Regions:
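General small-molecule cofactor/ligand-binding pocket signal
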Residues: 61, 108-112, 161
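Short secondary-structure boundary segments
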Residues: 62, 135-137, 164
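Structural beta-alpha unit
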Residues: 1-25, 97-132, 139
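Small/aliphatic-rich secondary-structure junction motif
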Residues: 19-76
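Acidic, proline/glycine-rich short linear motifs
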Residues: 2-23, 62-90
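Glycine-rich, Arg-bearing micro-motifs that act as flexible, cationic patches
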Residues: 131-155
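Short, hinge-like loop/turn segments at secondary-structure boundaries
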Residues: 75-79, 126-128, 150-151
Length: 164
């Protein structure tokens, strides 16, 4: 016969197994923002290693910029940014083919539209991200406006890792 303390502990343990709390058992969905820059590709590589170790889904996200001013002047903006996204997908596929026998990482590629910060927020929300990985900004202008990474950290909604 079990003591009442053991029975209570057993009931608590049973309740904990049935309840899932997002982000408590290690990340299951890791979002990595990529834009083709060296730092974003390092962030993707770091995120892939983390996803492999945690057996998590790696969601590689490219935020396609909306450049209405360029489009208004007749520049083929959508075509150019679409080519960037396609180039990134091809580069990622080539890298994963080379490494598929060494590492087995489940990954998906997603394209969102908008500015990088809002695009990554939308992606992280829609994909139910447990963690967000981004590369450090390589732009001097971000010292004044604020980098995407800093804005994601300030949002306080996910653990954010910034890869140099």
């Amino acid at each position: 016969m079990r003591s009442s303390a053991a029975a209570t502990l057993g009931a608590v343990t049973d309740q904990q197994h049935q309840r899932f709390e997002r982000g408590t058992d290690g990340p299951k969905v890791i979002v990595a923002g990529i834009d083709g820059s060296d730092s974003s590709m390092r962030a993707a590589a770091y995120a892939a290693g983390l996803a492999r170790r945690q057996n998590a889904m790696l969601a590689l996200v490219y935020v396609q910029p909306v450049m209405s001013a360029g489009a208004a002047l007749g520049a083929p903006v959508a075509e150019a940014t679409g080519e960037v996204a396609e180039g990134l997908v091809n580069e990622i596929r080539t890298a994963t083919e080379r490494l598929k026998d060494i590492w087995n990482v489940r990954w998906e590629f997603h394209t969102f539209h908008g500015d990088p910060y809002n695009g990554l927020v939308t992606a992280a929300d829609e994909l139910k991200a447990d963690a967000v990985i981004v590369g450090a900004s390589e732009s001097a202008g971000h010292r004044f406006v604020g980098s995407v990474a800093v804005r994601l950290v300030k949002a306080g909604r996910w653990p954010v890792t910034v890869v140099p």
